[in-house]
Amino acid sequence: MKMDADSSGTEHRDSRGSRSRSWREREHHGRTSERDSRKKEHKIPYFADEVREQDRIRSLRQRAHQSTRRTRSRSRSQSSDRGSRHRRHRQRSRSRNRSRSRSSERRRRQRSPHRYNPPPKIINYYVQVPPQDFYGMPGMRQSFGYQRLPRPPPFPPAPFRYRQRQPFMGAPRFGYRNAGRPPY
C-alpha cells in the first residue's frame, strides 16, 4: 500500500477493492455519521490533522473489540495497513515458493556441482618497527641493507651543507618514520 506522511492509508486502503470491503463499508465510505460528529464536538482532539484523528479513534474503537470477535470479513480498521501488510507478505512468500519449486529441477541440473569456496584467508605478518621509528627515539644511524657500522664513519658530515644562508631552523621536522630525534 502506498502511503504519504499524512495520508495514514485512508484513501487507498486495500489493493483488492470491492472484494475485501463489506457492503456496509462501501455504502458509508466517505461520510461520517451525525452521531460521530456530535460526539466529537466537546472533545479535544489528539491530532490537529483530522484525518489522522479519525484514524486514531477508529483504531481505538477497534482495539476494544479485537479480543472477543474474530470474523471472516475484515472490519474496516482490520484491513488498515497492519493487517494488509501481513496478509500481503504471506501471499507473496507463498507464490515465490510455488514458482521456485516449479523452476528448481531445471536449474539444479544445469549448474555445476557445488564446490566449497572458502572466503580468502587474510594472513597477518607482524613486522617489527625499529623503536627509533616508532617513538622517534634518538636513533641509531642505520645503513639500510647492511649491518650497522661498527664505529662511526671516519669524519662526520659537516653540520650545515648550505652555501649562502641556512633556512630557518626551529625544531627539526618530526614524523614517525623519518625522525632522527624527537621533536623537542
From Swiss-Prot:
Bias type Pro residues, positions: 150-159
Organism: Drosophila simulans (Fruit fly)
Protein name: Female-specific protein transformer
Biological process annotations from GO: cell differentiation; epithelium regeneration; female sex determination; female sex differentiation; mRNA splicing, via spliceosome; regulation of stem cell division
Nucleus recorded as keyword: yes
Major subcellular site: nucleus
Keyword set, alphabetical order: Differentiation, Nucleus, Sexual differentiation
Pfam families given in the database record: Transformer
Domain notes: RS domain directs localization of proteins to the speckled subnuclear compartment and the purpose of this localization is to allow colocalization and co-concentration of components of the splicing and splicing regulatory machinery to permit relatively high rates and/or efficiencies of reaction and interaction.
Biased composition range(s): Basic and acidic residues: 1-39, 49-58
Compartments where found: Nucleus speckle
Any one cellular-component term (Gene Ontology): nuclear speck
Feature: compositional bias, Basic residues: 59-75, 84-114
InterPro entries, per database record: Tra (IPR010519)
MF (Gene Ontology): pre-mRNA binding
